Amino acid sequence: LSFQEADLLVAIGSRFDDRVTGKVADFAPHAKVVHIDIDPAEIGKIRHAEVPIVGDAKDVLQDFLPAFEEAAAKQAPDYTAWWERLNSLREAYPLGFDEPDDGLLSPQWVIQKIGEMGGPEAVYAAGVGQHQMWAAQFIKYERPGSWLNSGGAGTMGYSVPAAMGAKVAEP
């Protein structure tokens, strides 16, 4: 919803793949796009960029930081109405899933239980596919860095080395 109604998208290293956009022609139809990517071939390949910027994301964002800080210091936006709208939509359309009639476990239920058992201190890693979407929806992530996934990159085999790295970082 926030993408669909946005008037500006700042896309950093985004491929605008169909897992992010759905039907590209209908994605964020009113938004101007600032597309930052180190690979010039990616900019504008799927979604037109009004402001194409070729460069390393770290360098580009460091260059932008003073302007962002200046704008934020002038007037902090009031998001109260936006949060009220989002919360009303969450209430009207809660996440859920149908329990199977055949006595089998639903994968959404299993993932939800894994999240409950792991709790807020756990770090979760997901591979690519439907389980990645369910894990994003049915596990409650309460701290930064606790959800490791390859996003729209579609990298099969990501989850095992990501989980190993997480264990090394937080034994």
PLM segments and residue spans:
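Active-site diphosphate/adenylate-binding microenvironment
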Residues: R85-E170
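Glycine-rich, acidic loop regions that bind phosphate or pyrophosphate groups
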Residues: L1-E84
